């Protein structure tokens, strides 16, 4: 049974990622929840996934191209899921063992090399460990991880489907 064409599945994945970013922006600008560094990395991964899916949907590639797009999208999913898992772990660490807060991104961009900025941001901060919102008992990074699992299913479906 054929559920969805490869192109329509890429469109659905793009729309799903656009919805996730819209929710993140709503939470930031309407609910007043400022994103931490790990949240920003997760947003970048969702945007990257969405852009790959959009390009794939516009291009409408054959079997090999579809798998290449799915593999590239899977890289964004893996990075985002790893970041969400890191943030979930930080939320379980006792407060006295959390990393200290970071200086502003503007300052770091002026004063530090890119590799050091990336290391500091991916390490996380006490700000990343704060649970500021929950729904159904799940925090934002847990919901984010659930979204990345859904994206991973799309990638696997596109990688493994037979024509």
Swiss-Prot record:
Membrane topology listed for this record: Multi-pass membrane protein
Which Gene Ontology MF annotations are present?
electron transfer activity; protein-disulfide reductase activity
Q: Which UniProt keywords apply?
A: Cell inner membrane, Cell membrane, Chaperone, Disulfide bond, Electron transport, Membrane, Oxidoreductase, Redox-active center, Transmembrane, Transmembrane helix, Transport
| Cytoplasmic side, ranges | 1-9, 62-67, 162-163
Which terms under GO biological process does the entry name?
Answer: protein folding
- Residue ranges, Periplasmic compartment? 27-44, 86-142
Known Gene3D superfamilies for this protein? DsbB-like (1.20.1550.10)
Q: Which cysteines are joined by disulfide bonds?
A: 36-39, 101-128
**Localization of this protein:** Cell inner membrane
Got a GO cellular component term for this one? plasma membrane
Which InterPro entries has this protein been placed in? DiS_bond_form_DsbB/BdbC (IPR003752), Disulphide_bond_form_DsbB (IPR022920), DsbB (IPR050183), DsbB-like_sf (IPR023380)
Q: What is the protein's major site of localization?
A: membrane
The regions listed as transmembrane in this protein's record are 10-26, 45-61, 68-85, 143-161
By sequence similarity, the record places it as follows: Belongs to the DsbB family.
Q: Which HAMAP family match?
A: DsbB (MF_00286)
Supply the PANTHER family for this chain.
DISULFIDE BOND FORMATION PROTEIN B (PTHR36570:SF3)
What does this protein's UniProt record list under function?
A: Required for disulfide bond formation in some periplasmic proteins. Acts by oxidizing the DsbA protein.
Q: What is this protein called?
A: Disulfide bond formation protein B
- Organism encoding this protein: Stutzerimonas stutzeri (strain A1501)
């Amino acid at each position: 049974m054929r559920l969805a064409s490869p192109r329509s599945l890429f469109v659905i994945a793009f729309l799903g990622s656009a919805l996730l970013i819209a929710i993140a922006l709503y939470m930031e600008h309407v609910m007043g929840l400022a994103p931490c560094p790990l949240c920003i990395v997760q947003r970048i991964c969702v945007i990257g996934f969405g852009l790959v899916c959009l390009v794939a949907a516009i291009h409408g590639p054959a079997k090999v191209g579809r798998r290449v797009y799915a593999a590239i999208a899977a890289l964004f999913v893996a990075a985002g899921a790893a970041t969400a898992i890191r943030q979930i772990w930080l939320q379980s660490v006792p407060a006295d063992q959390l990393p200290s807060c970071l200086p502003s991104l503007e300052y770091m961009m002026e004063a530090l090399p890119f590799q050091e900025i990336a290391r500091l941001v991916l390490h996380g901060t006490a700000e990343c460990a704060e649970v500021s919102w929950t729904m159904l008992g799940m925090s934002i990074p847990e919901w984010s991880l659930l979204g990345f699992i859904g994206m991973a299913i799309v990638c696997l479906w596109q990688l493994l489907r037979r024509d």
